[in-house]
Amino acid sequence: MTSLRKLERDFAHADAAAVAGLLAQLGDEDIMARFGLEARLADLQQEIARLDAAGDEPTASAALFFGGRPVLGQRGIESEFAGTVITKFQDIVAKVLARETNGLGQRGVVANKAASTLHITNIVRGSFGFLLEEAGLQQHMVETPLRAAVDEATRLLDAFGEPDEEQFRTAIETIDDRLLATARDFFDIMRSNGATLRLVSGGTDRSFGTEAVERAAERATSTTVQDSEEVLRGQLGGVLPD
């Protein structure tokens, strides 16, 4: 299920629960109000069933909800903080995509960065959040490389906040220096601004409270990457001409 569909389903469930609560408070004399609320509840239940039955979208999407010091409830968010932290998330996605496709060099321009571009397509309720989606006119039948990269970036960030140390170490076994450095920047921005985060992408729905942000920032700072040489033995079968 995409981030948008999951959020729509969550909101529909919340609205249905609120309507059911109002119905429970009505007396027998509130006939017209009951008719209206029952019709609204039926519509919400149909919407939930539609969202549950919908297939998974092959394109990338992620929703980032922020709370804490930079946020004024659902009214607004500090623009400098929002721009900086969203840019860092985009950088993580770009580096994951490069690593999984053309390879991520130790320095220099990130390969195929344009292909990793996400667009802010909506402001979503629930504290203050942004919906980021893969844009394009082409229809896709199978999962796009960017969808896989966004899901992997989300899994990686999730690992830094994971309470279990062993699960964290297992999840970051293949991380490289450039990706680690960008994750470090991301969580440093979160911590220094006193921000919290809920990150929704694919099947992941992860909340980073103050404690989780602190843990993630400390791990990103203290973790180091150690390279090792590996010898692979084989036989050259031939060389293709240029």
Each predicted region: which residue ranges?
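Short boundary/loop segments of OB/S1/cold-shock single-stranded nucleic-acid-binding domains
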Residues: 208-229
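Structural detector for short beta-strands of small beta-barrel domains
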Residues: 226-241
